[in-house]
Amino acid sequence: MVTWGITALGHDASITVLEDSKILFAAHSERYSRIKNDEYLNEQIVNDALQYGIPQKIIWYEKPLLKKTRQIYAGQWSEALSNKNLPKNYLKQFFDFIEPMPEIKYVPHHKSHAAAGAYTSPFSKATVVVLDAIGEWDSCSVWKYDRSITASPLKKLQSSRYPHSFGLLYSAFTQRCGLKPNEEEYILMGMSAY
C-alpha cells in the first residue's frame, strides 16, 4: 500500500512516500520553492512524489478540527473559522485527477513527532519526549515506545497543554532578542554558550 505522510499549512511543508513500511521518497517544499520554512506544497514536489505511486492513504500530521478548538480558545477567530486551512480542501488541488480522493487519516501533532523519533531510531523500546511550541493542544508530551506491541507501539503517558509551553517561551525570547520566532531559535541556542 502506498501511503503519503504530509505536513503543510503551518511551516516546513513536506511529503514522505511509504510503501508498506519502506520510505521511497521524502522532501521539503523549501527545497523546491526556495522559500525558507515554506508552508505550502507545490506541483513539483507533488509530481515527484507521484512517481512513486498514487497514495491509497494520506497521513496528515495533525488533527485540524481539534486545533481549531485551541484557536477559538486563544481568540484566533479568523484561523478557526477558515475552511482554507482544512487539509481535504487544500489537497483537492493536487488530486483533482483522482476520484475519489485518497483517504486522509489525521494523527495528533505530538504523536507525529513521537513516531518520527521512535520509528527511525535503532531502539526497540524507548521513552520519547516531544517538546515544541504547540500541537493541537499539547506543548510537551511523554510517550512509551515498544516495537514488540504491533497494534499500537506508541502510547502517550503524560502531556502538558497550551498555554503552558516551553517552546512558546523560547520563541518569545527569540523574538525579544530581535530574531525571527519559529526560525531563528538556533541562533539563540548558539548564543547561550556565551
Label each PLM-derived region with a short phrase.
Residues M1-Y194:
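Short acidic/glycine-rich loops and adjacent helix/strand connectors
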